[in-house]
């Protein structure tokens, strides 16, 4: 997924299909998003599934009252899923070609009372004072069109992301664990949120590492987390039991809410 203002031409969008899956590309063979044509609500890519792990930390009964912000549209998998949950959803994507392609090829609806798509720089969005505390869930996937490195990756940006979250909010970020920039990105997220508030999945086969960063989240008891994981897996067909196994060792020792950080 791609968004951020730079003094370069925005890449063209290309589409490919294979074995019932439609893929989004930006001038390169790198996959920027995917959709199963006969089941658009199915989240096809493993790392994108993991970006929904925030579901473990909210009761299903409040999903429809949850405010989601997505930085980087990709093929709209997260957007479609959040809309299906009834969530108020805001998407920020710099490249209007990506937005147009998603509406033509990836079942992205036009703006409605529940969906707002903004064609703008994600750095500007998180810096707007009026946005503070406006998101319960924040999904960040901001790699460039060559999937080389995040286009927004400063500590100031991640502090802006934290400011965007309401108390109890969760940010999920896609990084490449095999990339030389990973340790730097992880350190900046930890500096912005606090080390104890940051949790990592293991890399996917493709090398994607999803990072969870939390703002004053009180972890449910292990039995409650297990119940939620079972419900997510049964109802929405996401591998939440696996998420819990991957995250549990780090989550259990730190159940207390985190202290707030001073503003950047």
Residue locations for each model-derived region?
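SAM/dcSAM-binding transferase cores
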Residues: 1-17, 31-40, 46-49, 57, ...
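The AdoMet/dcAdoMet-binding core of the Class I SAM-like
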Residues: 4-6, 18, 24, 39-167, ...
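An acidic intrinsically disordered interaction segment
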Residues: 9-22, 169-176
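A generic structural signal for alpha->beta connector loops
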Residues: 12, 86-88, 112-114, 168, ...
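A short, flexible beta-alpha/helix-coil linker loop
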Residues: 29-33, 143-146, 171
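Residue-level recognition of short, structured coil/turn motifs
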Residues: 60, 107, 194-195, 237
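C-terminal substrate-binding/active-site "lid" region of AdoMet-derived donor-dependent transferases
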Residues: 155-222
